[in-house]
């Protein structure tokens, strides 16, 4: 299948491109990171340097494609950028898909668009409480892409769906909060986290499996939560301590007394029963295997933080 991956040079894109190409798909990558595109060059992969907000570039990228995996995002804190780059860019992508008779679009969504978790586990019927999201502008822009996809899915013969992600990881894992915990273990000898809070981590090969199941089943206008393993911040912090500084300790503060980032107190345990029921999705990893893989990703992050200290 001819597949376009937007944002293919990002944290998720590299692994997605690699696996799809190895499985025999013809992959085209659209990204503005010229150096990153060079690193992705391999048999079966075509690269195109450009921005999602450039309509002419998007039209060129979509030509002859049968499926699109949309990972591109500006991550700007400026609401105008989110509208002008991300929302408008997604509209360009949708319109180009219609014009080129694309069969599938899979949009990478985020738990942030759910706002604030009102229950546990969180399923796809959870309300989108944008005003209470940790990044309301980001959440709103992501929600707009979800809804645009639904509109186009029912107006045109394209299977457009959104995959909801809380925290994805592959051979590496990033994020300022994890880096902050590593730094605290190294410099303060302790990591302080809220008790009984955490989230559903998604291993990238499971994400790719979910994408492939969507391509096979062909639902339209749906949201799908995907997850590999749920971990509390206490568990993750202990994994960091074991690698960064075994003499450090983990301190769990009751949630009601927590004064740090609200991101850490929102408990994002994903209900993935919809994906299991409709797609036949299932994580390929046992809990022990998922934790071991995450430990490897954390090891790379620890090395990065140590080198910067």
Where are these regions (language model features)?
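N-terminal Rossmann NAD(P)H-binding glycine-rich loop of SDR-like oxidoreductase domains
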Residues: 3-23
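Mid/C-terminal beta-alpha module of Rossmann-like enzyme folds, strongest
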Residues: 185, 210-213, 217-259, 305-306
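Conserved beta-loop-beta element that borders a ligand/cofactor-binding pocket
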Residues: 110, 146-171
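NAD(P)H-binding glycine-rich loop region in Rossmannoid oxidoreductase-like domains
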Residues: 49-88
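A conserved pocket-lining segment of Rossmann-fold NAD(P)-dependent short-chain dehydrogenase/reductase
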Residues: 128-133, 160-166, 180-202
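Conserved Rossmann-fold NAD(P)-dependent oxidoreductase catalytic core, especially the SDR/UDP-sugar
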Residues: 92-137
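Amphipathic terminal alpha-helices
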Residues: 286-309
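Glycine/proline-rich active-site loop of Rossmann-fold NAD(P)-dependent oxidoreductases
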Residues: 143, 156, 168-179, 188, ...
């Amino acid at each position: 299948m001819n597949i376009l991956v937007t944002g293919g040079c990002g944290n998720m894109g590299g692994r997605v491109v690699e696996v799809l190409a190895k499985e025999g798909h013809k992959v085209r990558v659209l990204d503005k990171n010229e150096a990153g595109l060079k690193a992705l060059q391999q048999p079966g992969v075509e690269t195109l340097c450009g921005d999602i907000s450039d309509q002419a570039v998007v039209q060129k990228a979509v030509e002859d494609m049968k499926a699109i995996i949309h990972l591109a995002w500006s991550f700007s804190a400026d609401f105008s950028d989110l509208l002008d780059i991300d929302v408008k860019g997604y509209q360009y992508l949708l319109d180009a898909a219609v014009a080129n008779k694309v069969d599938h679009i899979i949009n990478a969504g985020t738990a942030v668009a759910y706002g604030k978790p009102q229950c546990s586990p969180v399923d796809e019927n959870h309300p989108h409480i944008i005003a209470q999201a940790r990044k309301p502008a980001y959440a709103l822009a992501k929600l707009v892409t979800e809804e645009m996809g639904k509109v186009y899915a029912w107006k045109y013969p394209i299977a457009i769906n959104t995959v909801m992600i809380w925290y994805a990881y592959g051979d590496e894992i990033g994020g300022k909060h994890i880096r902050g915990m590593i730094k605290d273990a190294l410099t303060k000898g302790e990591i302080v986290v809220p008790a009984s809070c955490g989230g559903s981590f998604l291993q990238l090969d499971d994400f790719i499996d979910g994408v492939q199941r969507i391509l096979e089943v062909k639902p339209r206008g749906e949201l799908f939560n995907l997850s590999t393993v749920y971990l509390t911040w206490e568990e993750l912090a202990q994994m960091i301590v074991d690698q960064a500084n075994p003499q450090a300790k983990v301190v769990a503060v009751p949630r009601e007394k927590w004064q740090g980032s609200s991101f850490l107190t929102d408990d994002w345990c994903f209900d993935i029963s919809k994906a299991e029921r409709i797609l036949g999705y299932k994580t390929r990893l046992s809990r022990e295997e998922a934790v071991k893989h995450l430990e490897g990703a954390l090891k790379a992050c620890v090395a990065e933080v140590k080198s910067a200290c």
